[in-house]
Amino acid sequence: MTEAMKNVFSRPLDIGYMIRNAPPALDHVLPGLLAETVGLVVGPGAVSKTMLALQMGIAMATGTPLLGGLVGGISGRPQKPERVVLVLAEEAADVVWQRLHAIMSVQLAALEIDPELAAELLEKNLGIHALAGSDQVNLLGDNWDKTPAGDLLRRACEGARLVVLDPVRDFHNADENDSTAMKALARHIASYAK
């Protein structure tokens, strides 16, 4: 180990303070997904996980109800447009273009949002990187360390409230059954969320 381990046991939680004071409100990005954490959407291929990610991204970027209101608001606060970055390793730009139009014509049209306002909000708040046919963005080095690609990803996602890597399998070359490698990958991704 090249650097000394930080003593993670030097500052236990202040139980007295916690008991005597109300806890802060939890900051949810999506229901069940706290800010600065990592979550997974898992399922077999071709069940529309990417379309779900696009719909979530569009809703957050425009401040419109998530999935047309099927998913309730969080903490009763009004929704505001938020920056979202989608990194789609298996999607070509033309496919994303088709899907954006499909979502705009159904999801946003049903909410009666002005199309020009929606376009402006999406242009400002939604970053999509369609990487099909591009070089792999490998976030896990040979010794499970961070990579230069991870630093580029972190910079591309600065200020984003939600970042989606789809599918996560395309962002590393490790054996997904290797728990050490997957733990390192999860820690790297979590560090980008800070």
Residue ranges and their predicted role:
Residues E3-S105:
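The Walker A/P-loop phosphate-binding site
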Residues G16, S75-E176:
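Conserved inter-motif catalytic segment of the P-loop NTP-binding fold
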Residues P23, N143-K146, M182:
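A conditional alpha-helix N-cap/helix-loop micro-motif detector
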Residues L66-L67, A109-D114, R187-S191:
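Glycine-rich loops and low-complexity Gly/Arg-rich segments
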Residues L152, A156, M182-K194:
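Substrate-engagement module of ASCE P-loop NTPases
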